[in-house]
Swiss-Prot record:
GO cellular component terms attached to this protein's record: cytosol
The protein's name in its UniProt record: Queuine tRNA-ribosyltransferase
Enzyme class: transferase
Cofactor-binding details, from the entry: Binds 1 zinc ion per subunit.
Gene this protein is translated from: tgt
Phylogenetic classification of the source organism: Bacteria, Bacillati, Bacillota, Bacilli, Lactobacillales
Catalytic activity annotation: 7-aminomethyl-7-carbaguanine + guanosine(34) in tRNA = 7-aminomethyl-7-carbaguanosine(34) in tRNA + guanine
Length: 380
């Protein structure tokens, strides 16, 4: 039986661990490294599928937990699965809901069977197990789905993380057995282990032995420093087979994307570009710009003079500032379009730099222009 997801390595950068490749899915082939915009509720906030396609997005992420709670996976399935339900014809990846259960849910109780918790919307008692998570994802119908895992806090004790990793491996095996559609949906295993190298190695060894079509690196970008995250990536990406995609979950600041690629990561997702857009914060080729600041009231230039997105081709900082200040939804639509375009096209430039074997030089120039080399620089 052919797997639903296949990875093809095209080239490795001569000076780093960066990989140029492509992932073949039932809804098209997309190049890697890639950034995936997040559509938590089956929509990337403030953006239409047509706008996403126009700016070059090839795959988006949706959230299993939120769609299970509302409207329910049965309704999405009845609507033809996520692709048809939201009218998106390209790739979709769903997480397993585990991260939300462990970060949002109140009064949770973790057992070997799964997690009992209260729904944060109405207080109802709910239960999510590896089998239930896979059933929901099968019904939602994404191209790529995640195993149910526990995401322990980065600074949790060694003993706690050890038990958590062992349980996550057992849950991964149960999820693999429960998976009904391996020929149309690729299931990834999630490597955990917080900052402990031996536990990350154990987690990777367990999951690689199960031969998933791809592997995610979880439990990062949860409050640890950039140096800590890069330290963990330095050894973790090497544990994943070369012929499988490597996905770093929940990472989306420009510096972290480039530094992740340098260490061999292929896929990234984050709510960052749309979340910061809603308060008027924009990523530009010259660094972070808060368009609602008073100094832009009479600035009739685009957000970024080097950007070809719909927003920068058509609207000025002064106009967008006016929209944000008056709480007009069109303003946050314009900033969202710009930020998502910025990250999608940053990855396009990164892919070209790998092709040209000059990713380190690209990083140096980008960091200088963006302002990462200044003291007290923001990370987005």
């Amino acid at each position: 039986m052919e797997p639903a997801i296949k990875y093809r390595l095209i080239k490795t950068d001569k000076h780093t661990g960066a990989r140029l490749g492509e992932i073949i899915t039932p809804h098209g082939t997309f190049p890697t490294p890639i950034f995936m915009p997040v559509g938590t509720q089956a929509t990337v906030k403030a953006m239409s599928p047509e706008e996403l396609e126009d700016l070059g997005a090839d795959i988006i992420l949706s959230n299993t937990y939120h769609l299970w709670v509302r409207p329910g996976e049965d309704i999405v399935k009845e609507g033809g699965g996520l692709h048809q339900f939201m009218n998106w014809k390209k790739g979709i990846l769903t997480d397993s809901g585990g991260f939300q259960v462990f970060s949002l849910a109140k009064l949770r109780d973790i057992t070997e069977e799964g997690v009992h918790f209260k729904n944060e919307l109405n207080g109802a008692n709910m239960f999510l197990s590896p089998e239930k998570a896979i059933q929901i994802e099968n019904d939602l119908g994404p191209d790529i789905m995640m195993s149910f895992d526990e995401c322990p806090p980065y600074f949790e004790s060694y003993d706690y993380v050890k038990h958590s990793v062992e349980r996550t491996s057992r849950w991964a095996e149960r999820g693999l057995k429960a998976h009904r559609n391996p020929e149309t949906q690729g299931l990834f295993g999630i490597i955990q282990g917080a900052g402990f190298e031996d536990l990350r190695r154990q987690s990777a060894k367990d999951l690689v032995s199960m031969d998933f079509p791809g592997y995610s690196i979880g439990g990062l970008s949860v409050g640890e420093s950039k140096e800590e995250m890069n330290r963990v990536l330095d050894f973790t990406t090497q544990l994943i087979p070369e012929n499988k995609p490597r996905y770093l979950m929940g990472v989306g600041s420009p510096d972290a994307l480039i530094d992740g690629v340098l260490r061999g990561v292929d896929m990234f997702d984050c709510v960052l570009p749309t979340r910061i857009a809603r308060n008027g914060t924009c990523m530009t080729s010259h660094g972070r710009l808060v368009v609602k600041n008073a100094k832009y009231a009479r600035d009739f230039t685009p957000i970024d003079d080097n950007c070809q997105c719909y927003t920068c081709r058509n609207y000025t900082r002064a106009y967008i500032r006016h929209l944000i200040k008056t709480d007009e939804t069109f303003g946050l639509r314009l900033t969202s379009i710009h930020n998502v375009y910025f990250l999608v096209h940053l990855m396009k430039d990164v892919r070209q730099a790998i092709m040209d074997d000059n990713l380190l030089e690209f990083r140096q120039n980008f960091f200088e222009e963006y302002g990462y080399n200044k003291e007290n620089s923001k990370n987005f």
